[in-house]
Amino acid sequence: MARHGDTRSPSPVGSTYSSSRRSRRDDDRYERKRDDGRSYRRSRSPERRYRERDRDRDSYRRRDHSVDRRDSHRDEDNYRRRDRSRDRRRSRDRDHDRDYRRRSRSRDRDYRSRRDDSRDRVRRRTDDSADLKRKSRRDDSRDRTRGAEPKSREASTPAIPTRTGPTDDEKRAERLAKLEAWKQKQAAEKERKQKEAEASGGPRNILEEIDRKSGLSPAVSSPQSPATQGVDAAPAAYAGKFDPKAIAKNAAQTPAAPSVLGNDVAVPSSAKTSNAQTARVQASKASGNAPSPAVLKAKGNVGSFGLGTKQVADNEKSIATKTLGFGEEESTRRKLERLPTPPLDDADASKTAETNADDDDDVDMQDGETEEDAAAAARVAAERREERLQNESLTKTTNGNTTAKAEEADKMEVDAQEEELDPLDAFMSELAESAPPKKKAGAKFSKAQEPEAIFGDEHDVSMTAVGEGDAEDFLAIASKAKKKKDIPTVDHNKVEYEPFRRKFYTEPSDLAQMSEEEAANLRLELDGIKVRGLDVPKPVQKWSQCGLGIQTLDVIDKLGFASLTSIQAQAIPAIMSGRDVIGVAKTGSGKTMAFLIPMFRHIKDQRPLENMEGPIGLIMTPTRELATQIHKDCKPFLKALNLRAVCAYGGAPIKDQIAELKRGAEIIVCTPGRMIDLLAANAGRVTNLRRVTYVVLDEADRMFDMGFEPQVMKILSNVRPDRQTVLFSATFPRNMEALARKTLTKPIEIVVGGRSVVAPEITQIVEVCNEEKKFVRLLELLGNLYSTDENEDARSLIFVDRQEAADTLLRELMRKGYPCMSIHGGKDQIDRDSTIEDFKAGIFPVLIATSVAARGLDVKQLKLVVNYDAPNHLEDYVHRAGRTGRAGNTGTAVTFLTEDQERYSVDIAKALKQSGQEVPEAVQKLVDSFLEKVKAGKEKASNSGFGGKGLERLDQERDAARMRERRTYKTGEEGEDEEEKDEKKNEQAEEQFNKVLSAVQSTSAQLPGVPKGIDLDGKITVHKREVDPNAPNNPLDKVGSAVADIHARLSRAGVMRSGVPIDNRGPDAGAFHATLEINDFPQKARWAVTNRTNVAKILEATGTSITTKGSFYPAGKEPGPGENPKLYILVEGETELSVTNAMRELMRLLKEGTIAAVDSESRAPASGRYSVV
């Protein structure tokens, strides 16, 4: 039954919060609940307390499990409440009293007995100082100074000598009698059942003694007879903390207790018993005496009777048994513990208790056995094993931490496994262990736990993964991480691709009946379509003839596409037939829909995408704006067809694009650079091109130009060879066509209206004017456009050739009152996107842009395009002018030419002629003038196409940025790559240094520029100063002239700045001199050898004189007669070695400055376009 002393509270057993602190704060309320109706509250005399103890102890045990047992707790609580008096709080034992109150909450304690026992124990501690340390530890762990008063100690002191003699004799006699009876009973009974041993009347007292030792119940720990008192002396401190001398006093009055076994079995105090047993093991271990193993023996024997076994298995090892598999060990322990040794051990333990008064906590029944030596020897292994388990449970129970218990058991198991595997480790463990059997038991113990070695296995696996790694693998991984991200080359012969369907077009009957002549006439009517190739399908006239699905046709109808454009009529049936197509058509002719609609039909025919599969349709564009526009054109079809598309371009966060690709997308619209980044990201796990069967290159001429061609070819090489490839552009030069045909298979070439022709709906105006008049003319054009109401919502697009010019023109137009914005490659992508959207929405009517907005930009109401700076080739002009006059609308394109831009006039005049417009006379004059210069060899004819700097410049910029980050953050991963790049950079610097390095010149006093020998190897040549033959040979005269010279210099010392060398008037100040020309070095190099800091260091180190002479001349300019020579440095010194060292240092600074200049150029290359300030 649950009592007030129950320890099943939220607070830990060892904490004082739930008892002492609460007792202090809520004294009255708490004691009213616990102490109503209790007696003996006012008695504080020792005599009365002793009488109460003598009278009630035996009766307390007799009614152990009766209802009256609660009264004993109440009596104890009354006594405890008495202790909280004013005098008690002034006592030194105030903290001990709190501990006593805390410990008294356990359910199975005889509090009055413990109170008296604490008094006697304090007295024994005073008498026997040798055992003070051990005694104090037991008091700390279990019941230190449990509220005993000083008066009670004094009263109990004289009673000890009178009780010592008879207690010993009675205990010895009683123990011999019990031993004989127990041996007879054991010989008669050889079964291991516990209840049969308990049912016998002979060993009843033995059971009670054993019960008190195990600490099951306060009732069991009370003495039954004089012989029992002697037995109780050993385990009393553990269960009830009774003094054997105090027990002997009342031995004659104590009757035998009723059936103890049944009561003990019914006691639900397993948790408390486990804690008590753990505390006893700790006390025994702390004492350092031999009885420590005996404690385990006693507990083992108790287990054989069915008392301790249940508690040990259920309480102390419940967690360990479940998690680590102690079942085999437990069965072995029960098998060995049934041997009949407790009486002899207990007798010997009582002798130990007589010798050491404080050893009653540690005395066991098996220390002094005389007849059971063989049985004890057989049980040694099990006892040592039990001791190990108890030591483990001590830490675990005290801390209340099951995780620590599991870890401790795991450590023990790992050690045991090592002992089994390695004899040397076993031997070392044997040396470390105090007893060899303990090691054997541990090894045997670990075998039972091996299947459950969870933590040990995990640690072993992790150590193996790190420790057994091959060094070459790590080096390979490191070198791989250093390499630049690149797409791995795919061997298509080793990859099995899924077959796919290419032909979806079936020629309608009305077109099949059409003859070739009729088809040619139809193509002529459709803006003069020109086709090249084999088996070209006839152009269609209606959407219904294209073989499209109903969903696609519904979207087309909703978009308002009533009829097909010329390029669509010919390109859609050609693409739907599965052929590779090159489509060239004028701007604004619907080329985007010509390749999008067949792509949707192509994708829907294939199986859906699975997890981590790449796209099916790939569309690449040269500009980010064009990619965004194509992606926007796809959206109406995506929802109807249940498809997904991703737009991937640089400038936007790549993580968002990666997330979209991982979710799956059938279509990806991208720029080449970002596509390479995505393919190389995460070692190619983001996306792949295995399922790509439909590739579109929009603005294909730009894609195959020098800037994009390597990237495009790198991507196409990773796509399956039997793909369908489609190329579209408004301009397609012949040289680009030859390059593009390498990627196609038997293509059909479709040209509508000419290869690079401006649409006839566009009015082209070309004017030749000065640079100053261009802005005024621009204001005039804008004023005329927005002067009428019908053009109120019109848009104007102004093209310039440089980023700085765009911002400058923006500022000027804003001052004139025109709301406008600018767009160019120097702006962030988010700014470019928002600017395009605002311009299309009409938020501002004027947009200033570079050629980045020349391709693919489709803006409604765009009626005026102004080429403020003339385009540099034909294709750029066509695309710029093609931003207006789209989809049949009219527009105007105005181009400004200056006198010095005659090389651009040739392409502009050609575009005018091809579009059927007249060439102005001023423009024709510029054309004729340029052609004459070409014939004369003064000029070179310009090639068509955009050209570009290729990937080398991009790689250089990326490498420079990466090196800058490495220097900033010092990642420690520079390694070989950094060394190689440093070598390349040094080589470049050496080349430039050698180009501009002038040899060290030796000069005479009168002619410093002679001789002018150049030493490209950078050898330092030092010349000795020539001696004037007219100079006086008298040493005194030399001294006088030197003194005069010094005075002359000192007189000017105050005039000169600090740190500046004194003017030495040429090479007369030292015996040796040398010169170093620095005029043609970069600015940083010149600054490195002329700034005062560096020069002062050299002067201090070498003792020379360094002077900067001459004048600086720009590159290509030579000094005229009578002018100062080019900038050079004069070094003078008294010894040749000093001059040589100074020159070497100056040349080193020159090299470093040159390298720094090269590095700065590669880090921030002068693009000549735009620089963000």
UniProtKB/Swiss-Prot annotation:
An example Gene Ontology biological process: mRNA splicing, via spliceosome
InterPro entries for this protein: DEAD/DEAH_box_helicase_dom (IPR011545), Helicase_ATP-bd (IPR014001), Helicase_C-like (IPR001650), P-loop_NTPase (IPR027417), PRP5/DDX46/KHDC4_KH (IPR056149), RNA-helicase_DEAD-box_CS (IPR000629)
Domain of life: Eukaryota
Motif Q motif per record, residues: 541-569
Extent of Basic and acidic residues compositional bias: 24-100, 107-154, 166-198, 381-390, 405-414, 950-973
Compositionally skewed regions (Acidic residues) per UniProt: 356-374
Signal peptide: none
CDD domains the record matches: DEADc_DDX46, SF2_C_DEAD
EC number: 3.6.4.13
Enzyme class, UniProt record, top EC level: hydrolase
Segments of skewed composition (Polar residues): 219-228, 270-290
Catalytic activity: ATP + H2O = ADP + phosphate + H(+)
One Pfam short name: Helicase_C
Domain Helicase C-terminal as annotated: residue spans: 761-927
Any one GO CC term of the record: nucleus
Motif (DEAD box): 698-701
Domain called Helicase ATP-binding: residue spans: 572-750
Family classification: Belongs to the DEAD box helicase family. DDX46/PRP5 subfamily.
Described function: ATP-dependent RNA helicase involved spliceosome assembly and in nuclear splicing. Catalyzes an ATP-dependent conformational change of U2 snRNP. Bridges U1 and U2 snRNPs and enables stable U2 snRNP association with intron RNA.
Protein name: Pre-mRNA-processing ATP-dependent RNA helicase prp5
Organism expressing this protein natively: Emericella nidulans (strain FGSC A4 / ATCC 38163 / CBS 112.46 / NRRL 194 / M139) (Aspergillus nidulans)
